[in-house]
Amino acid sequence: MNSRKKSREVALQVLFQKIFSEDSTAEELFSAFQGSFDLDPKTSERAHTLTSSVLKHENEIFAILESKSKNWRVDRMATIDLIILKLAIFELCFDKDDDTPPKMCISDYVDVAKKYSSADSKKFINGILDEVWKSSEK
């Protein structure tokens, strides 16, 4: 698995754990998780950046998600799908340091959904991220 994909999966797992450890900071959770993964420094730094940036921009990301999830209430989405979408929306709309092409970013997160979520999630996530990408190009 390449560094970019691994950092996304680590960030996903840390953000998922954050839901159940509300009193813990992202840094505390990331430090606890870091020992569970064999991460090189670049991957570790990227995963930490993704985690903290999604939390920092959570309100803006949520607003974008709500506007692009037609016929879907965000509060009814599966938790893991919601986290995958938040990570991807951060990368598509806010991450100016990453030069990953948008289509590749979307494809990578659809692959994450295939691995961590239900069979139907990949289509749902792909559809929302495609809408986000199209609107961010304008």
Language-model features: locations:
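N-terminal interaction/assembly modules
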Residues: 1-122, 126-138
